[in-house]
């Protein structure tokens, strides 16, 4: 009985590993855009948090300090979107596998 339980657990772990690889590839291909000031500044990042694009409306260029703050705000919004998408996608990859509280994926 113990042997069958262990084999089942190993199979489940292998399936989770395959799902994790697929999910990580999906995350790498993901792009999200955060924006600030009603779209005057847009920042696009990948699921790996790599900066892809920054779009700035010409009207936002008059005040340098404000523009700097808007870029940070737009990036922070995009970052939060990736965090949420990552958590949702990873929870699907680990479905059925008990994880310790506070355990974060990917490793």
From Swiss-Prot:
Belongs to the YbaB/EbfC family. This is Nucleoid-associated protein Pnec_0645. Binds to DNA and alters its conformation. May be involved in regulation of gene expression, nucleoid organization and DNA protection. Keywords: Cytoplasm, DNA-binding. Pfam families: YbaB_DNA_bd (PF02575). The keyword Aminoacyl-tRNA synthetase does not apply. Gene3D superfamilies: Nucleoid-associated protein YbaB-like domain (3.30.1310.10).
